[in-house]
UniProtKB/Swiss-Prot annotation:
E.C. code: 2.7.4.9
UniProt name for this protein: Thymidylate kinase
Organism of this sequence: Bradyrhizobium sp. (strain BTAi1 / ATCC BAA-1182)
Keyword list, A-Z: ATP-binding, Kinase, Nucleotide biosynthesis, Nucleotide-binding, Transferase
Name of the encoding gene: tmk
Function: Phosphorylation of dTMP to form dTDP in both de novo and salvage pathways of dTTP synthesis.
Length: 226
C-alpha cells in the first residue's frame, strides 16, 4: 500500500466481523471489502456464522430450518456455541495465525442480539458459552450495518425470491425492531470495537463507508514519500 500502514502485531492477521439485521447487506459488503483488501495485497479468508466449517454447517442447517427453535432458546444457543467452537478452532484461528485477514459474516454479537436480547437467554449463560467457545478471541473490528427494518425485510424477500423465509426472516416485525435496537446497544456499549454504518444506500456508497472504517481503525496514515 502506498499511503497506509497496517496497525498490527507481528505475524497475526486481522479479524473483522460484520453484523446487522436481516437484509442489511452483510454478504455483499464482506465480498466488496475482501476484493479491496486483496487488491492491496492482503490474504483474505471469507467465512460466516452459523457455519464456516463442515461441522458448523451441519448446525447451520438445524438452526435456520427452525429445528433449534423447537428446543427452546437456551438449547438453540447451545447449537450456535457448538458451531462456533468448531468454526473458531478449524477456520478462524488457523487463518489468523497464518497472517490472513478473516472476514466473518456474523459472530458472537449476533448470539447476544438474537438469543440474548430477544431470546432472553441470561447474560451469565452467554458469557460462559463465550468463554468456552472463543476464549480471548475478539474481533479487531466489528462493522454493524444498519437499515430500517422495513427496508431490510424487503431486501431479504427480494434476495430469496420464491423461496421460504428462514428461521429468523419469518419472525414478526416486533422481533426485527428489537433486533435493530439490540445491535444499536452493542455498538453503543463497545465503541472501540464497533462501528455503526448506515447501510440504507446502495452497495457502492456503503462500501466506501466500510473502507473508511477499516482504514481508520486498522490502518494508520503515513507520510507519502516525496
Amino acid at each position: 500500500m502506498a499511503d497506509v500502514a497496517l496497525k498490527r502485531g507481528p505475524g497475526r492477521g486481522r479479524f473483522v466481523t460484520f453484523e446487522g439485521g436481516e437484509g442489511a447487506g452483510k454478504s455483499t459488503q464482506i465480498k466488496m471489502l475482501a476484493a479491496r483488501l486483496e487488491s492491496e495485497g492482503m490474504r483474505v479468508v471469507l467465512t460466516r456464522e452459523p457455519g464456516g466449517s463442515p461441522g458448523a454447517e451441519i448446525m447451520r442447517h438445524l438452526v435456520l430450518s427452525g429445528m433449534g427453535k423447537l428446543l427452546g432458546a437456551e438449547a438453540e444457543t447451545l447449537l450456535f456455541a457448538a458451531a462456533r467452537d468448531d468454526h473458531v478452532r478449524n477456520v478462524i484461528l488457523p487463518a489468523l495465525s497464518q497472517g490472513s485477514w478473516v472476514l466473518c459474516d456474523r459472530f458472537f454479537d449476533s448470539t447476544r442480539a438474537y438469543q440474548g436480547s430477544l431470546g432472553k437467554v441470561a447474560p451469565d449463560v452467554l458469557n460462559a458459552m463465550q468463554r468456552v467457545t472463543i476464549g480471548d478471541l475478539k474481533p479487531d473490528l466489528t462493522l454493524i450495518l444498519d437499515v430500517p427494518v422495513e427496508v431490510g425485510l424487503k431486501r431479504a424477500a427480494a434476495r430469496r425470491g420464491a423461496g421460504a423465509p428462514d428461521r429468523f426472516e419469518a419472525e414478526d416485525i416486533k422481533f426485527h425492531k428489537g433486533l435493530r435496537d439490540a445491535f444499536h446497544k452493542i455498538a453503543d456499549d463497545d465503541p472501540k470495537r464497533c462501528v455503526l454504518i448506515d447501510a440504507t444506500a446502495g452497495p457502492d456508497p456503503v462500501s466506501l463507508l466500510v473502507w473508511d472504517a477499516v482504514r481508520e481503525r486498522l490502518f494508520t496514515a503515513v507520510a507519502a514519500a516525496s
